[in-house]
């Protein structure tokens, strides 16, 4: 590891931890956006000028009219009025605005660290991964929304991929922040067997997160609204009679 000064290590490490906090809240905001059915309320992707919301009734009506053209409005929300539209618009707008804020929270300190020559070639590559990865998450978010404009909802698989991309970026930031703050000093040591088990648990966790996103997106949990058993059974008797 490059011999960074303690000041540099802490500055970059805590900056990365801030990124983790921002991603955490972005995932929460994204979850609220999905639960309120707000994700398709903004039918355009304008990374720069889209930061400015409608400012008068004419602009609001124009934005609402664009929403009226998609399938979701025609089949699910045809009785929605402008006031109700503003409520779902808020969450999707807030979700996108937070993403822009995250971008500035990364780029401005990143540029400062480069100016101060605090970043060597190795760390530059690792931080570059964050920049590209974050861009991919944002771009995929729009691809996901655009795909959903032709249906009633955003496809659940798309939602799960979007979530996993964000959580993977979160995990990468945690690892890199720990690397900067502690260097080669491990927080604790584990036997190789436990390390392998730990990796297996992480893989299973990610699979469960993917499945959870799909179940949530399809509202499949409503089929068995009991816990911990499914209508009193560990393996529901209807399992063999059901098909996708």
PLM feature spans:
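Individual transmembrane alpha-helix segments
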Residues: 66-104
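N-terminal signal-anchor transmembrane alpha helix
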Residues: 14-51, 203-216
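Interfacial segments of alpha-helical transmembrane regions
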Residues: 11-22, 122-131, 187-210
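Interfacial helix-loop-helix junctions of multi-pass membrane proteins
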Residues: 32-44, 139-159, 163, 215-229
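Structural signal for the C-terminal ends of transmembrane alpha-helices
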Residues: 110-118, 175-185
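Membrane-interfacial catalytic/cofactor-binding modules of polytopic membrane enzymes
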Residues: 210-244
């Amino acid at each position: 590891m490059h011999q960074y000064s303690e000041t540099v290590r802490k500055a970059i490490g805590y900056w990365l931890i801030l990124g983790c906090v921002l991603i955490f809240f972005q995932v929460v905001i994204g979850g609220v956006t999905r639960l309120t059915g707000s994700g398709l309320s903004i039918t355009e992707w304008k990374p720069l000028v889209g930061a400015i919301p409608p400012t008068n009734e004419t602009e609001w009506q124009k934005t609402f009219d664009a929403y009226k053209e998609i399938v979701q409005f025609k089949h699910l929300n045809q009785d929605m009025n402008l006031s109700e539209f503003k409520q779902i618009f808020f969450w999707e707008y807030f979700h996108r605005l937070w993403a822009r804020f995250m971008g500035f929270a990364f780029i401005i300190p990143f540029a400062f660290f480069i100016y101060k020559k605090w970043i060597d070639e190795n760390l530059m590559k690792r931080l570059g991964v964050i920049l590209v990865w974050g861009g991919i998450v944002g771009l995929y978010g729009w691809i996901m929304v655009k795909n959903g404009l032709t249906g009633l909802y955003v496809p659940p698989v798309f939602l799960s991929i979007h979530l996993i991309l964000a959580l993977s970026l979160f995990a990468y930031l945690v690892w890199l922040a720990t690397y900067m703050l502690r260097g080669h000093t491990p927080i604790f040591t584990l036997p190789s067997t436990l390390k392998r088990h730990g990796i297996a648990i992480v893989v299973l966790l990610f699979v469960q997160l993917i499945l959870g996103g799909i179940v949530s997106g399809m509202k499949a949990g409503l089929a068995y609204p009991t816990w911990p058993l499914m209508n009193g059974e560990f393996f529901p008797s209807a399992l063999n009679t059901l098909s996708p």
